[in-house]
């Protein structure tokens, strides 16, 4: 198993911008959200299981998952949410492990929005948190998704607190400023992670 740097941050923090900056440096990026979409693509066994359990109305005419309908169905129903998690989490974990094993860069960047909520930081060698103020999160998300302040506040209330994320962080990128300010932080951390990954590999060798 290679060296894993987990990247997390709340909604609107700029995780994608940071991940893209690492990708530009040749680092393999493994995105938990993308994998979560892949395991329920048309034709996937998990999608058939969801249709069998929740009904065919969960599948759109083009064969894709009706995500909003599914979210509404499980939102106020813990049992149904648990059923869905029990179905999807092992598949997501399996595909994540596969992608980590296939990675060719000195370390991998594992982007996990719910790293703290699901205690997944224990599976990483290093945790990088993209930190912004709650007000910045609100403004960016309202602008990006064209949603109300109240809607974003509900999402923030359901996520781990800023303090909880920072408590598990080994490294922090302050992303309250302009997006182009990230490049120097990423370059500095990249050099550090290359060193850590090299040490990790040498320790792993018998």
Swiss-Prot record:
GO terms for biological process: coenzyme A biosynthetic process. Gene3D superfamilies: P-loop containing nucleotide triphosphate hydrolases. The keyword ATP-binding applies. GO terms for cellular component: cytoplasm. The keyword Nucleotide-binding applies. It is found in: Cytoplasm. Pathway: Cofactor biosynthesis; coenzyme A biosynthesis; CoA from (R)-pantothenate: step 5/5. Keywords: ATP-binding, Coenzyme A biosynthesis, Cytoplasm, Kinase, Nucleotide-binding, Transferase. It is an enzyme of class 2 (transferase). ATP binds at residues 12-17. Its EC number is 2.7.1.24. GO terms for molecular function: ATP binding; dephospho-CoA kinase activity. Residues 4-200 form the DPCK domain. Pfam families: CoaE. Its main location: cytoplasm. It catalyses: 3'-dephospho-CoA + ATP = ADP + CoA + H(+). Catalyzes the phosphorylation of the 3'-hydroxyl group of dephosphocoenzyme A to form coenzyme A. PANTHER family: BIFUNCTIONAL COENZYME A SYNTHASE-RELATED, DEPHOSPHO-COA KINASE-RELATED. HAMAP family: Dephospho_CoA_kinase (MF_00376). Belongs to the CoaE family. This is Dephospho-CoA kinase. It comes from Shigella flexneri. The gene is coaE.
